């Protein structure tokens, strides 16, 4: 159960990488991206499960399918990410369908299996219809969704936990709690051990269930995140 409450260094690196990618995309003409999304509005979406989406399979090495007619992505951008606190250098992969980012992930080595995957494409949805851009107030009402505030020892406060099954989460980690209404946000910030380690264990088992009204009307699904690191 500790895995739910704690984020290890690789997961933090993943979040930082995803965040930097989102900022980088602001340089793309938003009207062009929106036009492409609207043009493909009637296209049947790719379905994301905890096993992956399309040719992107979790627990398997990455196989570049950008030159095929699969349609999930047609461009791969490679790079490196150095996470100084862990002295860790990782290979980064960002996949695009024209100008729209589809997904990103990091690998320790080229042939390492994909164990974490962040999906940001509006052309991908869960089996229950939840997709990027959908209001959170609507998303959390869909079948199989779980939404709560859970205590996180690293941040010493409550964080938003929105999940679909065991390994698939929405919006990764939102320690800023910006998607919540002010009243609900205060409840999360009050979930703290105040530096007293004796109280931490008491908080670990507690959670606050979230309703659609706990989210701001403008809060939306920004990404999906699959984490399969802890499986044997």
Question: How does the language model describe each region?
Answer:
Residues 197:
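Short regulatory "switch" loops immediately downstream of catalytic or recognition motifs
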């Amino acid at each position: 159960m500790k895995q739910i409450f704690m984020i290890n260094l690789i997961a933090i690196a993943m979040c930082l990488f995803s965040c930097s990618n989102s900022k980088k995309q602001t340089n793309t003409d938003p009207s062009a991206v929106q036009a492409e999304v609207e043009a493909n509005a009637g296209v049947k979406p790719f379905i994301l499960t905890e096993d992956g989406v399309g040719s992107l399979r979790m627990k398997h090495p990455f196989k570049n399918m950008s030159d095929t007619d699969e349609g999930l992505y047609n461009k791969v951008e490679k790079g490196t990410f150095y996470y100084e606190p862990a002295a860790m250098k990782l290979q980064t992969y960002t996949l695009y369908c024209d100008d729209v980012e589809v997904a990103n992930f990091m690998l320790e080595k080229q042939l390492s299996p994909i164990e974490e995957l962040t999906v940001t494409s509006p052309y991908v949805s869960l089996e229950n219809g939840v997709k990027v851009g959908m209001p959170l107030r609507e998303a959390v009402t869909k079948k199989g969704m779980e939404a709560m505030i859970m205590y996180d020892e690293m941040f010493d406060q409550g964080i938003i936990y929105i999940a679909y099954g065991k390994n698939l989460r929405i919006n990764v980690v939102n320690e800023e709690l910006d998607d919540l209404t002010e009243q609900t946000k205060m409840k999360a910030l009050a979930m703290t051990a105040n530096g007293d380690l004796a109280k931490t264990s008491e908080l670990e088992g507690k959670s606050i269930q979230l309703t659609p009204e706990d989210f701001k009307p403008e809060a939306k699904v920004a990404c999906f995140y699959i984490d399969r690191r802890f499986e044997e």
